[in-house]
A protein has these predicted regions:
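Conserved alpha/beta-hydrolase "acid-adjacent" motif
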Residues: 248-254
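Hydrolase active-site cap/lid region
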Residues: 169-221
Length: 321
């Protein structure tokens, strides 16, 4: 049953839509971009958050500014001397660097310089709103501040934003310079999110069209462009796509779409870890490490020939508690 707040919001948008679908679409887009509370919900989330804070307690915090906002980045091994790799880690919607900290520390323990970015409206970054342009702008600011990357690793919305950033998808923002890309549970398209949101809010056809038009106006690319399978990934960029077929938040079809889009894309199924636990699962960390260190051998997928399937992982994944 819809909550009282949702009923009121639906009613308000419906009334505004009768007066002006354009204004209702703009209001709906603002609601769509409103970020959730930063407070962890439930005992497991609180425990994971506090453990993450402890892992990052000694990390350098750097404030990044960009058109439209500011973001906070955590930097590990920033003062190390000598040549070393540099990685960027980006969390998903409603998450933060704390929840990505196991992966961040795992990478830092290899001796690499690791930057973990809190997207606008998340973690210790300013704001209450997030959209693709803000996310890609924050990523560009991190790249400008710290330099070219050996790899960028992103989860969910963060992964999708990295894919768009590396392809130079948004006008006015320079492409992200990275040698490799790791996408964990990341969507390959955006249109479905707006359709689902429109249904949740009970938007009429005219207001739905205005919502999608506003998304295009703000981000600089029409919403339909986000759903094109070709051109989202740089064909010359090695990409590791990590996904679980039991992911209930982002369908595994998105991983298949990345793999089927051409280029040097490798697909790793981490079944049993869902959408959130996947970022700290031991087999996933091992797969990422192997991919980043260039020790992975690949073979053609026996299923459909799209992309490649990593050969070092065949057995079913044991669920973690």
């Amino acid at each position: 049953m819809p909550s009282f707040a949702l009923k009121v919001t639906r009613s308000g948008l419906s009334g505004l839509g009768r007066l002006s679908p354009e204004l209702a679409g703009k209001a709906a887009f603002r609601l769509f971009c409103l970020t959730p509370s930063r407070r962890p919900r439930g005992s497991k989330a609180k425990s994971a958050y506090m453990e993450g804070r402890q892992r990052l307690i000694s990390a350098e915090q750097v404030m990044l500014s960009f058109p439209g906002g500011r973001a906070t980045a955590y930097r590990l091994n920033g003062g190390a001397k000598g040549p070393r790799k540099r990685y960027l880690v980006v969390h998903g919607w409603g998450s933060s660097s704390e929840y990505m900290s196991e992966l961040t520390v795992f990478l830092a323990n290899t001796g690499a310089e690791v930057i973990s970015l809190d997207l606008p409206g998340h973690g210790r970054s300013a704001g209450r709103f997030l959209n693709v342009r803000l996310a890609v702008s924050a990523i560009a600011a991190a790249s400008a501040r710290f330099g070219a990357l050996d790899a960028a690793i992103g989860h969910s919305f963060g992964g999708a934003s990295l894919a768009l950033a590396s392809a130079g998808f948004l006008p006015g923002i320079e492409p992200l310079q990275t040698e490799r890309l790791v996408l964990i549970g990341a969507p390959s398209a955006m249109g479905w999110l707006f359709k689902d949101f429109g249904q949740l809010m009970g938007l009429g056809p005219a207001t739905q069209m205005a919502l999608e038009a506003e998304a295009g106006r703000v981000t600089g690319r029409a919403l339909t462009a986000y759903d094109e399978r070709r051109g989202i990934l740089d064909p010359g960029l090695p990409v590791l796509v990590v996904h679980a077929e039991d992911d209930k938040e982002v369908s595994a079809d998105h991983a298949r779409a990345y793999a089927g889009g051409g280029g040097d894309v490798r697909l790793f199924w981490a079944n049993g870890f869902g959408h959130r636990r996947i970022v700290s699962a031991a087999p996933v960390l091992e797969a990422i490490s192997a991919f980043l260190s260039e020790t992975v051998k690949t073979e053609s997928s026996p299923e459909d020939g799209d992309g490649t399937v990593l050969s070092f992982y065949r057995s079913p994944v044991r669920r973690s508690s």
